[in-house]
């Protein structure tokens, strides 16, 4: 009996020690000093426990009543700890999508306040610049310093020496496609003349199946449907790319009831090069992929006889992260990104809004709120 309990305890400690050792190696490989330190200390404690277990067995300690009690507690405690980690129920807030997290009054977000619109679109000295910072003086000094450092992403290639030349060349090349797909007649396409303005009859079930299948065929990795919550529609236009300053500050209205939201996986190898330029090259590549998918998908829906608007890097009407959460692609993480079950936050999003009748997907609960409450790795790592 005692020998069996000792064997079970030793096996349990060995499994935990091996798991912790693998965690330490992974943390060292990722350059995560804090995680490696905590993991290393834990591994030493577990290894010490394993050695102590066999040392006490050798002297016959576990044949005594105190030794037997310690052995039983040593078995019960980790079992109870593991049971406490098992989720006993779903998170009702997550299952409501973004509605479950709204507290008080929420106003629609003005795209002009978005960091890229402020630092990339607003020319210093322009009328729009003066108008914006007269309304938001708290950001002017901070944004001016950011521009001096090269904008939202800094000076391209500054930390890549001596490889900055080809790296920056790849960076700008990776962002070269979306501008060609951002004009109004492309993001809001008309049907091909072949269809003579006729609607193709599809049930919501078949339309949903075909739309999702086409998006996956085009290269999306995840696809979901959401009913559009007006709160996640930008209130006013802020990103300007073709000197169409008459649109700056114009009200954005989306009359479409549905959003087709899709996610694309980013290369793990490329993302792990961050903060070097290769990680941004991957962002540009996946943004280009998203622009292609959204454009093709909107054109497909237009050919069916319905209205559709592509949302991608050069045209956004809606905030994609809350829309993706409502479409069941994942949950909002503490780091501000969508956390997916399949890829974590290592994704980019795209969207098409439409009046094509579709079947919405339910929001999901994958445990992100509970995980983020104890992890906080983003808070420790963010500069």
Regions found by a protein language model. Give the residues of each.
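Catalytic cores of enzyme domains
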Residues: 221-383
